């Protein structure tokens, strides 16, 4: 279907139904996007098509629906990043340092999609991975990495004071402080 819509607005760029054709071409791509575990190139195409529709027709009655589809597609991309970061975390030290890959993947997802509803889950993955990175570090880097884990605990507590992960954060904080020899310090 999307080919028919695309051919219509390419052949009749000023046609009566060009607005609808552009919208439905984007919607067809939206409906055709795969689940987050799979390759997301179709999701990027759908976002691009819907953004082009909104640029060409900023006053369209379909603009809000197109914007909502873009948000849903971005959520799918965030979920893909979250699943990748979680996979790296679960792989741990298998065949290299996957904890660092987890941190980088999750931080990039937070940078690219700052308003995601998975922000808390990505942040706890970063904290867990930084802590595990400290635990399995060589002696020279261990103290620095424990400090990074403590800093991440503070950042997490500030951003998510009512988090469902707070007990785990407190446990990591106490263990990291203990390893740094700062256990008597107040939280």
Regions found by a protein language model. Give the residues of each.
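TPR-repeat structural position
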Residues: 43, 94, 99, 143-146
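Short, small-residue-biased leader/transition segments that mark boundaries at the very start
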Residues: 3-4
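Structural signature of tandem alpha-helical TPR/SEL1-like repeats
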Residues: 39-48, 79-81, 145-148
């Amino acid at each position: 279907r999307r080919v028919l819509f695309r051919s219509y607005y390419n052949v009749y760029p000023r046609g009566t139904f060009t607005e609808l054709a552009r919208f439905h071409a984007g919607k067809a791509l939206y409906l055709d996007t795969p689940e987050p575990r799979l390759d997301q190139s179709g999701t990027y195409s759908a976002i691009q098509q819907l953004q082009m529709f909104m640029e060409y027709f900023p006053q369209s009655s379909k603009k809000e629906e197109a914007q909502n589809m873009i948000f849903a597609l971005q959520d799918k991309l965030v979920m893909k990043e979250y699943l990748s970061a979680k996979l790296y975390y679960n792989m741990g030290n298998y065949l290299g340092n996957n904890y660092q890959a987890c941190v980088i993947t999750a931080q990039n997802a937070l940078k690219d999609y700052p308003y995601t509803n998975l922000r808390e889950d990505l942040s706890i993955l970063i904290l867990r991975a930084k802590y595990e990175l400290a635990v399995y570090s060589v002696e020279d880097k261990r103290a620095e990495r424990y400090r990074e884990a403590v800093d991440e605990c503070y950042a997490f507590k500030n951003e998510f004071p009512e988090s469902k992960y707070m007990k785990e954060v407190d446990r990591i904080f106490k263990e990291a402080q203990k390893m740094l020899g700062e256990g008597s310090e107040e939280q």
